[in-house]
Amino acid sequence: KRQALDGEASDDSVEPAVMNENRRPPDQINIVIDPGHGGADPGKIGASGSCEREVNLAISMITGEMLTERGYNVFFTRRDDNGLYDDSDVNKKAADMRKRCSIIEEAQADVVISIHQNSFTDSDVCGAQMFYYTHSAEGKKLAEIMQESFRKFVNTDNTRGCKANDLYYMLIHTPCPTVIAECGFLSNPEEEKQLNDNVYRNKIALAITEAVEKYFGNDSSN
């Protein structure tokens, strides 16, 4: 210890607390959950025939319910298996993506979590991975927190790191920190089975929820 000028002892070893600039109570935070694909767009098809759009929706609804229970304002880009386009749209995929971004803007989202599943030619490849917009520092921060949260709550053996991307439409055209959460590989038979299990889906929802809590400074460490 050293003596302060006013005669009181002070301790140089005590570091000041780091302020979380994003810290706000949950009821002041708008979160958009975006279940990827839908309608005529099935997304990836699993090793045993699982449809990504259905897995995405199931995980999204559980996640949304969990976040709502924590007090957050939750919005969805879709709540059913329909796509976000009109039958008359020539390019349904483009119309769908534009509509998703419109919903996000209308919700005045603070963060967006887009739920997806991965696939690869090598069926041994597995593990969740988060993607963020290359030029978004806050998106990177959220993705890093979420990647670690998946490692903690879903699979401690997952060595993947989050990854920057400047090509995905959803990352480029959203005005707030956005993470595309590739929750696992449907091309891996074991992981496909897990992704269709509600206990495992709840682990994913918990990982996402705890990541959001930490990002906004509402977790137990703050």
Regions found by a protein language model. Give the residues of each.
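Generic alpha-helical propensity signal that fires on short helical segments
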Residues: C51, V90-K92, F131, M146-F150, ...
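Gram-positive cell-envelope targeting signals
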Residues: K1-A4
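Catalytic-core regions of hydrolytic enzymes
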Residues: G7-E144, K152
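Active-site-adjacent mobile loop/cap segments within catalytic or ligand-binding domains
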Residues: A107, S114, T121, N158-N222
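Proline/glycine-rich low-complexity loops and linkers
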Residues: E144-R160
